Amino acid sequence: MEEQPQMQDADEPADSGGEGRAGGPPQVAGAQAACSEDRMTLLLRLRAQTKQQLLEYKSMVDASEEKTPEQIMQEKQIEAKIEDLENEIEEVKVAFEIKKLALDRMRLSTALKKNLEKISRQSSVLMDNMKHLLELNKLIMKSQQESWDLEEKLLDIRKKRLQLKQASESKLLEIQTEKNKQKIDLDSMENSERIKIIRQNLQMEIKITTVIQHVFQNLILGSKVNWAEDPALKEIVLQLEKNVDMM
């Protein structure tokens, strides 16, 4: 990236006006390449930090007897974050290489144009081709810029999707936690002393009711009344035959 200023200084007496026009795109591309390098460095640092956090979480989990739902959720979120960062790093690397190739093409075209202008003023056809090549390079840079804009939008969509995924996982964790709490509360209620007393009283009432049923059945049968012909008495007998435990 330092060869261009030296070449421009050497050619400045011959054609200073053409240099001003041809120096613009490489400077813009150079600035974009530097920005891509800074971004890639930041992403690499974030990936290293995230991997370190994952190792710490794994060591903490291995030290415990079993994993809690919160720890499992944190591991999944960290793994998804690492995967997204790695994908983003690869995209930045590809974009950086494309920008570097475009910058090299611009430099080569500018250098060839200046050399051809010095060597021969009669090669107009070749000069036209070189100018056409420069125009094509500008169109390529424009298309690449549009492609990078689309990549930025795609990255935003992926971030939103990750946020929605994390929100849904957090909601599921809340639901599971609430279910576990309800189960614990139910178990504690079943094991409480008050529930035991209520159950004992209920069993006592069932036994008393069963004894009363048997007494009434024996009275009706002992009276030798034809209860099948009396609807009211028949209904009473049928009720007495029901098992109280099944009610």
Curated annotation (Swiss-Prot):
<dbReference type="InterPro" id="IPR008426">
    <property type="entry name" value="CENP-H_C"/>
</dbReference>
<keyword id="KW-0832">Ubl conjugation</keyword>
<dbReference type="InterPro" id="IPR040034">
    <property type="entry name" value="CENP-H"/>
</dbReference>
<dbReference type="GO" id="GO:0005829">
    <property type="term" value="C:cytosol"/>
</dbReference>
<dbReference type="GO" id="GO:0007052">
    <property type="term" value="P:mitotic spindle organization"/>
</dbReference>
<feature type="coiled-coil region">
    <location>
        <begin position="47"/>
        <end position="192"/>
    </location>
</feature>
<keyword id="KW-0539">Nucleus</keyword>
<keyword id="KW-0158">Chromosome</keyword>
<dbReference type="Pfam" id="PF05837">
    <property type="entry name" value="CENP-H"/>
</dbReference>
<keyword id="KW-0175">Coiled coil</keyword>
<keyword id="KW-0007">Acetylation</keyword>
<dbReference type="GO" id="GO:0000776">
    <property type="term" value="C:kinetochore"/>
</dbReference>
<dbReference type="GO" id="GO:0005730">
    <property type="term" value="C:nucleolus"/>
</dbReference>
<protein>
    <recommendedName>
        <fullName>Centromere protein H</fullName>
    </recommendedName>
</protein>
<dbReference type="GO" id="GO:0051383">
    <property type="term" value="P:kinetochore organization"/>
</dbReference>
<dbReference type="GO" id="GO:0000939">
    <property type="term" value="C:inner kinetochore"/>
</dbReference>
<keyword id="KW-0597">Phosphoprotein</keyword>
<dbReference type="GO" id="GO:0007059">
    <property type="term" value="P:chromosome segregation"/>
</dbReference>
<comment type="function">
    <text>Component of the CENPA-NAC (nucleosome-associated) complex, a complex that plays a central role in assembly of kinetochore proteins, mitotic progression and chromosome segregation. The CENPA-NAC complex recruits the CENPA-CAD (nucleosome distal) complex and may be involved in incorporation of newly synthesized CENPA into centromeres. Required for chromosome congression and efficiently align the chromosomes on a metaphase plate.</text>
</comment>
<feature type="modified residue" description="Phosphothreonine">
    <location>
        <position position="68"/>
    </location>
</feature>
<comment type="subunit">
    <text>Self-associates. Component of the CENPA-NAC complex, at least composed of CENPA, CENPC, CENPH, CENPM, CENPN, CENPT and CENPU. The CENPA-NAC complex interacts with the CENPA-CAD complex, composed of CENPI, CENPK, CENPL, CENPO, CENPP, CENPQ, CENPR and CENPS. Interacts directly with CENPK. Interacts with KIF2C and NDC80. Interacts with TRIM36.</text>
</comment>
<feature type="compositionally biased region" description="Acidic residues">
    <location>
        <begin position="1"/>
        <end position="14"/>
    </location>
</feature>
<dbReference type="GO" id="GO:0005694">
    <property type="term" value="C:chromosome"/>
</dbReference>
<keyword id="KW-1017">Isopeptide bond</keyword>
<comment type="similarity">
    <text>Belongs to the CENP-H/MCM16 family.</text>
</comment>
<feature type="modified residue" description="N-acetylmethionine">
    <location>
        <position position="1"/>
    </location>
</feature>
<feature type="compositionally biased region" description="Low complexity">
    <location>
        <begin position="24"/>
        <end position="34"/>
    </location>
</feature>
<dbReference type="GO" id="GO:0005654">
    <property type="term" value="C:nucleoplasm"/>
</dbReference>
<feature type="region of interest" description="Disordered">
    <location>
        <begin position="1"/>
        <end position="34"/>
    </location>
</feature>
<keyword id="KW-0995">Kinetochore</keyword>
<dbReference type="GO" id="GO:0051382">
    <property type="term" value="P:kinetochore assembly"/>
</dbReference>
<dbReference type="GO" id="GO:0043515">
    <property type="term" value="F:kinetochore binding"/>
</dbReference>
<feature type="cross-link" description="Glycyl lysine isopeptide (Lys-Gly) (interchain with G-Cter in SUMO2)">
    <location>
        <position position="67"/>
    </location>
</feature>
<keyword id="KW-0137">Centromere</keyword>
<dbReference type="GO" id="GO:0005634">
    <property type="term" value="C:nucleus"/>
</dbReference>
<feature type="modified residue" description="Phosphoserine">
    <location>
        <position position="16"/>
    </location>
</feature>
